[in-house]
């Protein structure tokens, strides 16, 4: 494996105005296919039923689940665990000054921030939109319809006759990143692909009955790792096809009326090999980062409204059934099915003007996607989820793929952008 250098790909600014639709030459497309094969990536153009409805109701989750015994927490938080909370004078949250008090009924309707689950991993979870039920005016959609939230959206797809739901985010003006299991059944080769793949940026309600703030974009081309296609990825025993090195996909979206999705809503950067992670004795020498997770879990607001979760994420190492090193990231989270494919970002938010002696610290680049929600536990008690680690691993050992990054994410993005350069 080549040197594991941490890095990111920079985000381009949001651009306004119409863009001419890209014209892709046949020779370029063939070159893209050759590139995909050489770099361990499989591409597929999903079928789109003409004017297909996205389905009714919340939809079915694609999030794969495992038991706690298959991939136990082990020492992940053992060295971080403090005392159980008491009614004494220890640290506690104050009531704040955010406005008038709420009735018990109103509080029950809100998504309350929670401290931790049975794995004692702290997190904070909340709905993104500043509203309770319904969206009577555009102001009630704030901040979900503003940047940077709106570069994340709800992903719908069809397997067989059923509609399923996931989440995804833009990392190029016309390219999404999500979980591979959202668009492909592990190891099923030519029979594993989803159809009718659709992306709704900043979704705020039921897309089958209500037009969304930024409409819908359909998938033009999907790319997944060849090992995921073949069913030969490095995976945890008892969780083959679930806890794996490369549950990652990128999707090239069709432009709409001459505009790419990112030119309307913006897009993020992406990173690899642990960008903004740090090995710290303050965290028991674990390799950790402060991570913001976005997604559309069905158990919260029927999966119609974006949820935000913040927690420390930790790189976890294991050994796959093939004897190779398994790399994942875990974090504390109350999200459930439907959150699959949603971005895990470091340094979420927008920059403030720095004055005086303040500094941004090390590795401060904003809105860097370093993972996508991949799996959770069958029990709702642990409140922990996992994601394939973006970067070099056994299957994608190179430190650079065409100047677009290292490892799995570099290979996938490079393949997509080689075949569809105008979308990048």
What are these regions (language model features)?
Residues 2-34:
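Gram-negative bacterial Sec-dependent N-terminal signal peptides
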Residues 33-170, 411-424:
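Protease-domain processing segments flanking chymotrypsin-fold serine proteases, especially trypsin-like
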Residues 129-150, 156-165, 171, 192-262:
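Conserved catalytic-core segment of clan PA serine endopeptidases
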Residues 155, 168, 174, 178, ...:
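Terminal peptide-recognition signature
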Residues 182-184, 203-207, 255-258, 297-299, ...:
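Acidic glycine-/aspartate-rich tracts in secreted/extracellular proteins
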Residues 244-332:
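Chymotrypsin/trypsin-fold serine protease catalytic domain
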Residues 333-372:
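Catalytic nucleophile loop of clan PA
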Residues 366, 370, 377-424:
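C-terminal cap/linker of serine protease catalytic domains
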